[in-house]
Amino acid sequence: MSALHPGNEILPPRERGALTLYLVTTLALLLVLMVFGLLMRMAQGTWLHVPPTLFYQLMTAHGAGMVGTVALGGSAVMWYFLRKYVSLSLPIFLTNYILFMLGAVLLLAATFLGHYAGGWTFLYPLPVKSMGIWSVGAAALF
């Protein structure tokens, strides 16, 4: 142990693995979502042709994904610091991860398979009045 790594801050292997899973996933999602943002900027600059429906799907996934990904990474950081003061459950931490990933898959399925493109804010009337662009099921999944 050293002053930089006191004994009470070293994670047991299973907890270190869970925290690494969260952080690697957060970084991977941020990279994918940055690519979505870059594609939108390239389309706006006429460097790349992106159909309007795909543009709004990218915008929806980018916005909702950035907010959610920051929440995922933030929960990992909070768990790391809070565990020194409160007894936290590793199974609950992993359950949170699984539920988050399930939500991310549903969001992506609604956006790219169901063609949902109502924007990340999900403001009325877009989710309800899609003008035939996406289904009610896609809006419900989102």
Predicted features along the sequence, with ranges:
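Transmembrane helix-loop junctions at the membrane interface of multipass transporters and ion channels
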Residues: 118-124
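Compositionally biased amphipathic helical and low-complexity segments enriched in hydrophobic
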Residues: 5, 124-127
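Extramembrane terminal tails and long inter-domain/linker segments of multi-pass membrane proteins
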Residues: 1-17
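Hydrophobic cores of alpha-helical transmembrane segments in multi-pass integral membrane proteins
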Residues: 18-45, 55-118, 130-142
